[in-house]
Regions:
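Intracellular juxtamembrane helix-capping segments at the cytosolic ends
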Residues: 33, 143-156
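Loop-to-transmembrane helix entry/capping segments in MFS-fold secondary transporters
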Residues: 73, 104, 158-168
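Helix-loop junctions at membrane interfaces in 12-TM secondary transporters
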Residues: 120-134
């Protein structure tokens, strides 16, 4: 019973909602860019014997005899490289940010970065916008996940963390699937519409999260334990002082 109460605290629920928004945005981005840079269709073969008849048959059947060019292969490589780099950067920066600020600030900060990235992508050329949004969104989602895990351990110290993380991760995966479904529904629209939709969703998540964590985001000192506080010799969880930083 105590575990359920801890896991249903407002801080954890609000952070889980923000994390679900970011995961949905990642799923949306994945399918949006997959459709944007998909390959083209081959036209009617026009070489060798029967070239003229093949072209004529294609015209009669109202087929595209020339085909539609797909995105260059290096576009995929550039977007994937940015997404991978963003994920690595987020995993690298989150522990360092945790030493400087509380988890609520990290989550709100990466929400803002993801929102700014999706808005700016709509004004950039296709490949440049895709690279920017994949880099910033992957990094934001990675940092937010580590901050969320830390927040759960901080606010629910007596909970079964393995089971709790598995439960939340399952919900986040459903959010990812929901985001990808939305991308499928608007796949035939211009990619700028997709960026606008993504920015709208992340922006709503930011508007939801900020007012509900105003008190928790106040500047407070991070107290790092230096002596073992557990029977197995492990250090205790980082806590926050009630004194504000100057």
């Amino acid at each position: 019973q105590g575990e359920k109460i801890e896991l249903r605290s407002s801080g954890i629920i609000n952070a889980a909602t923000a994390m679900a928004v970011l995961r949905a945005a990642v799923g949306f981005m994945t399918f949006l860019l997959a459709f944007e840079f998909r390959g083209g269709e081959e036209g009617v073969p026009m070489e060798g014997t029967g070239r003229a008849s093949g072209v004529a048959t294609g015209l009669i059947r109202d087929q595209d005899i020339l085909g539609t060019p797909g995105a260059p292969v290096w576009h995929y490589g550039a977007v994937l490289a940015c997404a991978s780099g963003g994920a690595l950067l987020g995993a690298r920066m989150a522990p360092r940010l945790r030493m400087l600020m509380v988890e609520e600030r990290i989550i709100s900060g990466v929400l803002f970065i993801a929102f700014a990235g999706t808005v700016s992508a709509s004004w950039l050329p296709s490949i440049s916008g895709a690279m920017v949004v994949s880099l910033l969104l992957a990094g934001s989602a990675g940092s937010a996940k580590l901050a969320f895990d830390s927040l759960v351990q901080r606010d629910a110290p007596d909970a079964n963390h393995g089971r709790s993380f598995a439960l939340f991760e399952g919900r986040f995966q459903l959010s990812w699937a929901f985001g990808s479904l939305i991308a499928l529904l608007i796949a035939m629209l211009p990619i700028q519409v997709g960026y606008f939709t993504m920015a709208l969703g992340v922006g709503l998540g930011l508007v939801f999260y900020l007012p509900r964590t105003r008190e928790a985001r106040k500047a407070q000192k991070i107290i790092t334990p230096e002596e073992p506080q557990k029977p197995d010799g492990q250090l205790g969880f980082w806590t926050r002082s009630t004194e504000e930083e100057n």
